[in-house]
């Protein structure tokens, strides 16, 4: 916990991981429920094709994103990824019954998934000492799992009582808050990890920084 006090922007990231886990979970929870309500048994077939599109876009987009967006800092990849995930999911609220747009939004969602995936792990390893990687990854997994688990229960009850439109609205509100948290993480990151911004390398990463203290903490100890 002393590590988190010294690197307060990591606390914001834990919030991003938690809310992001809740929003992302709707891909396998609220979305198939909605497809089933709209199309009955055929909804499972449509959702199956959507997941196939998801897998195909992951295969095609990952090398493209890695090659052409490699110099974007990991924290900005997370912001971009979470934004695309939110847009790709929440917009299903507005395209009910327009099947071709389902696949357009799934493509947007999946590209966001790719950006987020290639940004998250480097973000953690470059800002946390290697001695704490295991513990931090456990905390992140717990936060994400707790938010998604409790969130799915609440979304399920909301669907039963108020319908899918209200459930998607909650996802949209949570998504906006998620994007704001990710933006705040981008803003505060340079304050707590200035050394990461000193060299113009892919991801902005000086060597072996993950085992050092944030410059703001070090400068405070010299006074």
Predicted regions and their residues:
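A membrane-interface helix-boundary motif in multi-pass transporters
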Residues: 157-176
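Short amphipathic helix-loop junctions that connect adjacent transmembrane helices
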Residues: 29-46
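Helix-to-loop junctions at the C-terminal end of transmembrane segments
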Residues: 60-74, 159-160
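Juxtamembrane intracellular "pre-TM" segments in multi-pass secondary transporters
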Residues: 1-13, 203-215, 220-222
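Intracellular juxtamembrane helix-capping segments at the cytosolic ends
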Residues: 115-128
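Structural signature of the two symmetry-related core transmembrane helices
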Residues: 76-91
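Pair of pore-lining "gating" transmembrane helices in MFS-fold secondary transporters
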Residues: 7-26, 107
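A late C-terminal transmembrane helix in Major Facilitator Superfamily
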Residues: 127-162
